[in-house]
């Protein structure tokens, strides 16, 4: 028994385009909402949670629908094609609405422009505002108008050009207040933006479960951790490509905080469509799924009657399996509570607290994950999925705990090291958690159980942007990493109670043992 890496890579192009989209979405939408619409962290968190609210019912629904779908292209492929096409078109349309809002801010949007700074000061001089750290201030009590209009986004320090803390602490919040005033005066643009955002999110939700369920459809159960490592490797490749693109477009630069995203989103859409074309030209879903079922019978992994019942539905779980599934899903909720809080807020945190390029830091995390995926899949096949996940949770908690003590003066290398550790940890968790869920079901229920997995993760992602945003508004942005560390610690505890879903020792399969001897 040996994993067909070529086929798995081709299947992974669906996840590649999904991760490309979400990397761009998570990094840019919070910046648009806060910088151009002037939303608080809490309200931007509400908007960022919309996709997760939709996912709570749409992912299980479309996972189950795809289980029952019988089409010429297979069960999953039609959903992937339709969802991707709509999402790519609507993403570009979203940038046009973003540009419309930018026009409402034309008198205050120019960076380092004295006239724009004068307008900001005149409008917000006597308002009580908040720094990114949560400290209240009144602009007129901190600066005269002449002092304020001399503030620049960057200053020279020790021979280096660095972000000016006065700019991020005082100019940015004041300009965001102006943006909120413009939004309140003309709310139609925000309404239209949210409507288009909903269309994009619905189209992505339509095919996420079918896309992820395709891997178990065409992969034997003992090989799914290795296959999921390849799938996640493809996803990370999509994410790191978008992060590199962000560096090219300088999306995290202070001078580009009010940039137009049309060109950037157009390239993202092109990447998604290119991946879809490769997927369509290479993946033979129905043929590969049938071959997998025949191999499962030949190797004794499933009885012939089980394989024949794949299309009809699944089996009922035992009481112990139900308990394990509940604790596993609870663990998924908890570690996503911690992890997604960081990913959804880090672009804002890095810009305002660390004064660092979030693209570079996240690229390091993705690169570390990419290097780890295949070794982690191999380790899990030997040590077991549960033990491997527990090790990953410990690493993730360590990374978040150390990161909580870092600030703008901390060595950049140290923050990069912590994000590298977090990338390795997340790879360790991600490679094994999804296979543990689908290990408990039959092939006829893979889409439904994929929906369970994503319902758990999305339930956390509904609440955590709002909760972390509220805490950041109340106590300052420094609360982000301690918040994340608490939830990953709780995930370690609940994971200890999971007793089912682990990979079975491969040595039990004679053909596989022979294959390993040949290797």
Residue ranges, per PLM feature:
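Intracellular loop-helix junctions on the cytosolic face of multi-pass helical membrane proteins
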Residues: 1-3, 104, 109-196, 202-207, ...
